[in-house]
Amino acid sequence: KTRFEGAPGTNPEELIGAAHAACFSMALSNILAGEGVTDVRIETTSKIGLDQDAGGFTIKTAHLTTTVSGNAEPSVIEAAARKAETGCPVSKVLNAQITLEVTVV
């Protein structure tokens, strides 16, 4: 849910989510290329969980959902995705619980 309540616009948290999804996808693509897997399609979204406490708002969670199709074994894609989850620079900078859901098609 955006802070703009139906009006056009994007808030900083949505931009962080978009950056996280893009960074993860790029990291996953790079890791797979290192494994010799180059014919893939990666689509990733990130859902940011924003909580309010006495000190203000805090990003508590980031949930990545990625769908990968291509010429690799699902186990190779899964392993690369787990590595990308913790290895992408945006994941490293977030002080939040990061979860990942991978679908291989």
Can you say where each PLM-predicted feature lies in the sequence?
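Extended beta-strand/beta-hairpin segments
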Residues: 1-18, 22-105
